[in-house]
Structure formats: structure tokens, C-alpha cells
Amino acid sequence: MRIGGIEAGGTKMVCAIGEVQTDKGQPGENQVTITERVTIPTEKPKITLPRMAAFFEGKGISSLGIGCFGPVDLHRASPTYGYITSTPKLEWQNVDMVGTFTRALGVPVGFDTDVNAAVLGEVTWGAAKDCDTAIYITVGTGVGVGVYCNGALMHGLVHPEAGHLLLQRHPKDTYAGKCPYHANCLEGLASGPAVEARWGRPAKELADREDVWEMEAFYLAEAVANYVLTYSPQKIVLWGGIMHQSQLFSMVRTKVQELLGGYISNEK
């Protein structure tokens, strides 16, 4: 069986085709081999979407899955289901992603946020394999959080927007915050643009600055501790450009344990 996948991002669209092997007979054990992949810059929708559709045309895919930057409408009964909604990327507001590819390709289209797609991948094949509840956090240009809870992706009033979790400030932080909606949310204080604006240099040029990463770990750990208390995940996966600073992992883990104060303890 041949399937298609799209990682729809604010700067690039990654489109891929995969072959699904089902020899083992168990749905959770299916393996997908990527046979073709292309990266398309995210320009205006009228330029980008036809290029994406053209990649899949004539390839014989039976279905397509889209993990998309947001916010997006995930309510199937909504007239705007499958749309990108109030994104800061003005040209992409109210763009019908599901409808566009359904019409172009004539196959079923699955649709969710990019981070929910990522956490689904982690529980299916990756670091959170076989977990009933897991969280995926990407820390880069923004902060996104995907939640897989009791065997299903979490939806509700909207999809999880836990990247905008409100935080207490680090006692030495005088930076106002990057988020235009919430001065002291996780994205506003810990995203890549926030790090650069606070310290005057991009994160990749600050690797040797202990004070930078102590403050970053403070904010990430504060959020992670709250996610542990709220969602009770068996695994939390951290990724994104900021997490290329590998020293952060141990710093965040130590700070999370400190914040939880022994109330919840798990060696993993």
C-alpha cells in the first residue's frame, strides 16, 4: 500500500511517499519505507499548494496525511474543518488544506496539527512507542505541544495550545517576551526568537553561555513540570532547533525533579 504525507510548516513543506509493509499482521507494527521526498518553500498558497499537489499526482497513493502548522480547525462538523485559521502568516489564513488535496488527489485526507502528527509518530515508531499517554514539545521558531492521551490524539475546544502556557518569570529575566498575545508564556520566553531577542545573538552562537541555558532550562522545566501534573504522560519528547543544545536535556530533567519536589517520581 502506498501513502502520502505532508509536514506543512511555516517556512517549508515536506512532502513524501511511503510504502507500508503489513507482513507482521499487527497494525501497530506496520512499517513505512519512504520512497520519495521533496521540500517545497512555503510561499503564497496559490504558488505552494499546486506544487505540492503535483508531487503526488499519478503516484498511486491510497490516502494522504497532513500535519500542519496552525492554528487549524479540527472539528469535522465545522464548515471550516481542515482549514488553517488565525495564523500570523496572513496569506495562509482561512486556507482549506483538506479540501484542496481531496479535490486534487481524490483520496481520503487525514489532518491534524504538526505537533500532534509528531507525537503520533513517536508513539507508533519512536521514543514513546507503546505509551498510552505521551507529549511532544518542539522548541524552535515557536513552541508547539502535541498530546497523545489514553490512546488518542487530544482535541477539544481547540487543539492543545500548551506552547502558550503562562509561566512565572526567572528572577533575573528582564526581557518583555516575544509573544504578541501573552508576555510571559512559554513561547514568548523560551522560543528561538525569544532567546535571540533577549541575548542579542541567535541560540547557535550562545552554546558556551551557561547563563543563557540555565534560564532556558528554567522555563522549559517549569512547563514540563506542569505538563507532568496535568497530563500524567509516560514519556515527554523534546525537539526543535533550541534542543540542538544537548546540554539542555539534563538541565531540564534536574530542574523538573526539583520543581516536582518528589510529589511525582519516575526514573524514566
Q: Positions of the model-derived regions?
A:
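ATP-binding/phosphotransfer module of carbohydrate and carboxylate kinases, centering on a glycine-rich
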Residues: M1-L64, V72-T80, G99-V107, T124-T133, ...
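Active-site glycine-centered loops adjacent to acidic/histidine catalytic or metal-binding residues
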Residues: E7, D114, G140
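A charged helix-plus-loop insertion that forms the helical arch/lid used to bind
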Residues: S78-W92
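A conserved active-site-flanking secondary-structure segment within enzyme catalytic domains
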Residues: M154-H170
